[in-house]
């Protein structure tokens, strides 16, 4: 799909930042309007992250206009908002391929463009990496500048504050731009405040500020008075001095949709020494009313009709696993006031909207703070409550030490509802849930369950909730199979279920690839086992299958290395059972973006692929 660039005459003149910087500044508002419309048209036809990009159009234009990218380093935190950046950096004609197999990466990606200096996807990494680049630039001595753009959500994470504290300590030259879209632009982000921001960022003010400090350095009372006067001046129109306490020179807030103010302020700040923080106010979804009204709903969108102002409904009548979890959570909370649900800023994605409204006293959104979420849950468990941590597989990686040190070592009854296990689709390498079975399986005291359908998911959540120790239920992104939901009951810990009896080959399946494995088993006349538990492994059943069959095949949507299949291998070797084993799962690579079924087919994890791998191995 390609758009008629003739409809965007100013944008047509700026295929890359070099061309953008040749435009007269008077044309920048027109460029922003066209860029926003181009983004709207492209995403509506191809799907993708939407509201965040609309909110940073003016900022993106201003940054590339003022800074000499790619020589100067521009870093986008997380990267949801980077579509305008990609459009302006030579990828305009390919933006409609974003998040698709073999298309543009969903986030800034070093291998895709020299303008993407940091590969991202997870939040709050930009300032740490940016500080490292700033230190390297100082050693290089060529005047290279470093700019990090981070949102008001991502900056709350501990890693961001750790980086700012370090930056303030070593006083490296860098600019952090806080993109604050939590509220609409208010009156105090108007003329006076924009004027003050330009004044405070100007060279004359900076010179007087530093000169005054030096002149009165021997007179502490006067120096303190000057500092208090400066803070009082800022305090009339800006937020707290938190960033100043961390060692940053704070400027703002300014209107993030006034491209002229942004360019002038950035020009003023470009040559300032030491760590700088520019606070801008933006509106997520800017320029498209439905997205402005519901930025969360329009965060990532399927194809839609811009004229309708609505998103298409899901075509599937089957519930998602996230919905199954959310319904179970509400059902359990209705009977048990000790349940406490914890999420690190993933309420919508984890299916917890209804729970948060109906049980607000039992719901904790701890923001983007996975480490805190896990240890907070440990504290709740020590206090006699029953915490349930709802977290994506890829984000649990960020709290690995807390999982071991604060939960497992103390054998605390914390249930982890791990969403997005396995292939997630369009978000690619940074979001695949490829490693959780591997990194949890080696932790003592953990019970790890992998349901084959939505009914088993409910039963496992119930079982894990009532287990007196740490437990994890790991389920995928997407819809269930249509399984009948049975009354909740405890499953026997560490016991699998024989689903089909065959000959010679026994397929041991962990998780929701069971339906695909079933088809392969029927075609091969193989035995099929729903293993259910990754840990503790059903050793008795595995050894029985080894005794009755010529070969074993393990199937899982997790990295083969260290995964559930590795557990089977370890058991057989420990018991001196010399049975050939084929491990089928995710290969030793970071799986790129693509539709889930598309990538399963490519990786040999659909029914045909499983059968093909087995037949090739036996040939």
Curated annotation (Swiss-Prot):
It comes from the Bacteria. SMART domains: Transket_pyr. Thiamine diphosphate binds at residues 80, 121-123, 153-154, 181, 288, 370. It holds the Pfam family Transket_pyr. Keywords: Isoprene biosynthesis, Magnesium, Metal-binding, Thiamine biosynthesis, Thiamine pyrophosphate, Transferase. InterPro entries: Dxylulose-5-P_synthase (IPR005477), THDP-binding (IPR029061), Transketo_C/PFOR_II (IPR009014), Transketolase-like_Pyr-bd (IPR005475), Transketolase_BS (IPR020826), Transketolase_C (IPR033248), Transketolase_CS (IPR049557). The keyword Cytoplasm does not apply. One of its GO terms (cellular component) is cytosol. GO terms for molecular function: 1-deoxy-D-xylulose-5-phosphate synthase activity; magnesium ion binding; thiamine pyrophosphate binding. Its cofactor is Mg(2+); thiamine diphosphate. Mg(2+) binds at residues 152, 181. The keyword Ribosomal protein does not apply. CDD domains: TPP_DXS, TPP_PYR_DXS_TK_like. Pathway: Metabolic intermediate biosynthesis; 1-deoxy-D-xylulose 5-phosphate biosynthesis; 1-deoxy-D-xylulose 5-phosphate from D-glyceraldehyde 3-phosphate and pyruvate: step 1/1. It catalyses: D-glyceraldehyde 3-phosphate + pyruvate + H(+) = 1-deoxy-D-xylulose 5-phosphate + CO2. One of its GO terms (biological process) is 1-deoxy-D-xylulose 5-phosphate biosynthetic process. Binds 1 Mg(2+) ion per subunit. Binds 1 thiamine pyrophosphate per subunit. PROSITE patterns: TRANSKETOLASE_1, TRANSKETOLASE_2. Its EC number is 2.2.1.7. HAMAP family: DXP_synth. Homodimer. Belongs to the transketolase family. DXPS subfamily. Catalyzes the acyloin condensation reaction between C atoms 2 and 3 of pyruvate and glyceraldehyde 3-phosphate to yield 1-deoxy-D-xylulose-5-phosphate (DXP). This is 1-deoxy-D-xylulose-5-phosphate synthase.
């Amino acid at each position: 799909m390609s758009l008629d660039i003739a409809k965007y005459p100013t944008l047509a003149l700026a295929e890359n930042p070099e061309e953008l910087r040749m435009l007269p500044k008077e044309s920048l508002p027109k460029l922003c309007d066209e860029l926003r419309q181009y983004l709207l048209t492209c995403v509506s036809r191809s799907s993708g992250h939407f509201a965040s990009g609309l909110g940073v159009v003016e900022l993106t234009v201003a940054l590339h206009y003022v800074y000499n990218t790619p020589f100067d380093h521009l870093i986008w935190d997380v990267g949801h908002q980077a579509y305008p950046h990609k459009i302006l950096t030579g990828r305009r004609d390919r933006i409609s391929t974003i998040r698709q197999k073999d298309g543009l990466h969903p986030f800034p990606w070093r291998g895709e463009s020299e303008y993407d200096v940091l590969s991202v996807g997870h939040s709050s990494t930009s300032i740490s990496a940016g500080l490292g680049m700033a230190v390297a630039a100082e050693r290089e001595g060529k005047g290279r500048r470093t700019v990090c753009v981070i949102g008001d959500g991502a900056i709350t994470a501990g890693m961001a504050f750790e980086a700012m504290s370090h930056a303030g300590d070593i006083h490296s030259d860098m600019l952090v731009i806080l993109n604050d879209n939590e509220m609409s632009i208010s009156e105090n982000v108007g003329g006076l405040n924009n004027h003050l921001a330009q004044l405070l960022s100007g060279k004359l003010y900076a010179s007087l500020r530093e000169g005054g400090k030096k002149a009165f350095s021997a007179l502490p009372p006067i120096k303190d008075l000057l500092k208090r006067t400066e803070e009082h001046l800022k305090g009339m129109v800006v937020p707290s001095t938190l960033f100043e306490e961390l060692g940053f020179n704070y400027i703002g807030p300014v209107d993030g949709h006034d491209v002229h103010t942004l360019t002038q302020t950035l020009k003023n700040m470009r040559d300032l020494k030491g760590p700088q923080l520019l606070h801008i106010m933006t509106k997520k979804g800017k320029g498209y009313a439905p997205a402005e009204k519901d930025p969360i709903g329009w965060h990532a969108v399927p194809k839609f009709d811009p004229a309708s102002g609505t998103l298409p409904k899901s075509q599937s009548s089957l519930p998602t696993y996230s919905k199954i979890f959310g319904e179970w959570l509400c059902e359990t909370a209705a009977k048990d006031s000790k349940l406490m649900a914890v999420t690190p800023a993933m309420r919508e994605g984890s299916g917890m909207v209804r729970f948060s409204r109906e049980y607000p006293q039992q719901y904790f959104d701890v923001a983007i703070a996975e480490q805190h979420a896990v240890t907070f849950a440990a504290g709740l468990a020590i206090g006699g409550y029953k915490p349930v941590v709802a977290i994506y597989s890829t984000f649990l990686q960020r709290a690995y030490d807390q999982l071991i040190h604060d939960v497992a070592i103390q054998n605390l009854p914390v249930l982890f509802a791990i969403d997005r296990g396995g292939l997630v689709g369009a978000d690619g390498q940074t979001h695949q849930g490829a490693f959780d079975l591997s990194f949890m399986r080696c932790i003592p005291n953990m019970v790890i369950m992998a349901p084959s359908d939505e009914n088993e998911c409910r039963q496992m959540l119930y079982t894990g909730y009532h287990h007196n120790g740490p437990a994890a239920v790991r389920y995928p992104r997407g819809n269930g199979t249509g399984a009948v939901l049975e009354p909740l009951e405890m499953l026997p810990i560490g016991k699998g279920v024989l689903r089909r009896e065959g000959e010679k080959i026994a397929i041991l399946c962990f998780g929701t690839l069971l339906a695909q494995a079933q088809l392969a088993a029927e075609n091969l006349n193989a035995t099929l086992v729903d293993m259910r538990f990754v840990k503790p492994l059903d050793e008795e059943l595995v050894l029985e299958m080894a005794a009755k069959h010529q070969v074993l095949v393990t199937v899982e949507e997790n990295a083969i290395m260290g995964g559930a299949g590795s557990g089977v291998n370890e058991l057989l070797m420990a018991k001196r059972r010399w049975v050939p084993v084929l491990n089928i799962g995710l290969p030793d690579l970071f799986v790129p973006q693509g539709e889930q079924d598309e990538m399963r087919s490519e990786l040999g994890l659909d029914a045909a692929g499983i059968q093909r791998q087995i037949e090739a191995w036996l040939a």
